[in-house]
């Protein structure tokens, strides 16, 4: 029996450390003082029932050694013209990224389920060929690992043709060159007005640029609005616009040919900065002076009050009840493999409950944000975060804040914009958590007297992506009744805009000169459920009131509630527009039945408050077409691995992947199916979003819940269950495992020293 204990005082733990308890080989501290409790086990008891049934690394992200090998092979194959992406200019050839090439599902299942040889382990590399006569982006598959011998160009196979060079993500080197252009060449042309408004000095460090996207208004453009903000080094600069925005055309391969196409300053547009300065000198510009300590309000995250009593802590009196081996997590109920796509973000594979596979893949695909405003950057911004990299911009998890202090933390290795692998420490965490709520319970006071119940204890897999200002907390939560919850929480700084004119039509004022612009957050997920096997059917169930004569009084009528059931036959029938009607119960079912003759199924239940979808007459809507649907179910195809693309952000007008193409009215009866789920919320920033948006109320996602999959509620077999009846001694350890706590939980947790994974260098 294992129970979490909440500690609200640190005294016991501090005493234990100060007295210098020594850990034994089993992780249990020896008492150096008779009044001090022993240390709790730091490892799982050896007799726990879980195992890692498959040690295959099919879904494991590439190791540092594999990444190094692939980069060496690519350097050898692509020749001496290859430049380190960290230093590459637009006219250079460079390897942008290397990550795992996921294996075909059929080959993976043949290995996992039937013992066939594992499919070749391969890497996917994205290469920028800026030095070729026709600059382009190429995707290369390299394998087999660990000793690659081939490199296969899959660009045409995957995308139907070459990838235009202007679709490539912006490298850090390109951003630095743009900054150099702005600060060394452009801003000095308006030194007078900028000194007046914003304490500008040439060569100073008080200002910085903020990026926006997309980059233009039509395919082929590479023109970005950059906002100028105060450089608040001890807090977020995101809240401190000075009212200057520059439209920079950086499509040319030579940075010397980049130009500023338009200037916006505090409510008016100018052809260039020289024109702005000329009109300022002529007294034709009404300048709002912005204090050089920011635009007012509270912006620092440093608390102004001293630390208080230590918050509650959860720990494992008898050691963790799960284990992590490589990328595989196992507990007594659940097993799954985890990973992180460099661009698409967190994902899990081969998810099994009590040994039976429920899902082949559950993965984040895209996160989008659509903004409004009356400044050019705000009104144009439509972010697709895979275009920046939700894995690439993952951040170290902070022990005790991002995850429980005693969670298990894992690193991630990657190659993005570098010739050598980098390591993100503490990129993932896994922990078991008592949610302080019963999973189920009943206290019987009638006819017979008893109590039965079980605590809601869950297994959580988590990562966090910081997309410049916003932080997204990504959770996959595994429940003891076979349910899975997939959830997104948003926090961090809002993206702000300069306040002028009719700004309040587009949000709320959150600072003296700062608008919090209205925007939407949406996340799109791929859910490859395999309910009782690969052949699944889609059922929609709901309710209806049906007028019925009362059998014993036929002259009277009642509105009788009954269940409506419909099998959905095609992809069109199973595509539910965002904001439209959808069945309250929708589930994927197997051809197998449970004990009661119902098809074994898993229900998809969304928890979402998404804003309206982008209008389909928008020229860039097709890049966001996944956002049309709250839920869509399609046949699974190897040719439809993802609902979005790293290349969609910089060319949304001709998207590399248009999710709406996946829905082409094919049959979904008895097929291997994928559910595509959208979850999101509308955010109208307000005063309480300063300095940071909080996670409370800003969490959305979906549940995967068993629906007649079992013959009864599966947690009835839980070793955590509690039951006692009248006449029994509920305080007896033999009757009630909770009564064992005074003996079982007299240890103090062996807390690791606090450490921080550092600040990634991009």
From Swiss-Prot:
Keywords per UniProt: Calcium, Copper, Disulfide bond, Glycoprotein, Metal-binding, Oxidoreductase, Secreted, Signal, TPQ
Catalytic activity: a primary methyl amine + O2 + H2O = an aldehyde + H2O2 + NH4(+)
Gene3D superfamilies tied to this protein: 3.10.450.40, Copper amine oxidase, catalytic domain
Named cofactor requirement(s): Cu cation; Ca(2+); L-topaquinone
GO biological process entries: amine metabolic process
The keyword Signal is assigned to this record: yes
Record-listed Cu cation binding positions: 519, 521, 683
Subcellular location: Secreted, Extracellular space
Positions of region (Disordered): 23-54
Main location: secreted
Binding residues for Ca(2+) 2: 571, 662, 664, 666
Protein name: Primary amine oxidase, liver isozyme
Organism encoding this protein: Bos taurus
Taxonomic path: Eukaryota, Metazoa, Chordata, Craniata, Vertebrata
